[in-house]
């Protein structure tokens, strides 16, 4: 059986990539959000962790884990990575195929609803995100950044890129991000999240036994309160000439 990916754009200017198939025992649903590095770099580093630990409906990790158990042990993850002068925030959930459930209910559909709610309905109000949870997320994010030095290969690659791109946004150093992470407030995190929803480039990848129409319907419902979206235009800085060789040695 041939598997054919289908790419479309919803009325909310969200990219949708669907690969509908019943060949697998699991479904993988992934939200990718592209945002510019710069003003909210530290906030995005925190958001990538914060968003997969709670939501408005499941306002604690215990409640969220309980919901994941109800979805037959669905696996949830969040990450952030650099792509040029942009950050890619990725939220992903993996669940069993609907044909394997005992009661015949749609685990895939429910998992997609949960994933979308984590992005569009986090545990925040008009005053900002929860100060208590934010404190925990800042600590976890800081520990993750500081811990990279223990992976010498990753640390060396990071330092090389920071040195090569010292005069570019892409060269934003871990120390600069770490310093700003500790200054993140509930209000600044809320501002970054609002920008992400309104102006981020969002793509949903849905692989499994779920249709394009079902995905579009759930996307429409999830983003109904967001308003008109205006995704930003990414800009890439090209360096046309090679500069002098720079050597850097650090003793650890």
Regions found by a protein language model. Give the residues of each.
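Active-site glycine-rich loop that binds ribose-phosphate moieties when present
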Residues: 181-191
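His/Glu-rich zincin catalytic helix
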Residues: 1-72, 177, 190-252
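Short, polar/flexible loop-turn hinges at active-site or ligand-entry regions and domain interfaces
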Residues: 54-57, 99-102, 121-130
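M16 family metallopeptidases and their MPP-like homologs
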Residues: 17, 25-42, 62-119, 154-179, ...
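Structured segments of extracytoplasmic/periplasmic soluble domains
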Residues: 50-53, 71, 117-122, 144
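Glycine-rich, mobile lid/loop segments that gate access to catalytic sites or pores
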Residues: 138, 142-149, 160, 164
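A common structural junction motif
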Residues: 113-125, 221-230
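Acidic/histidine-enriched alpha-helical segments
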Residues: 65, 121-145, 231-241
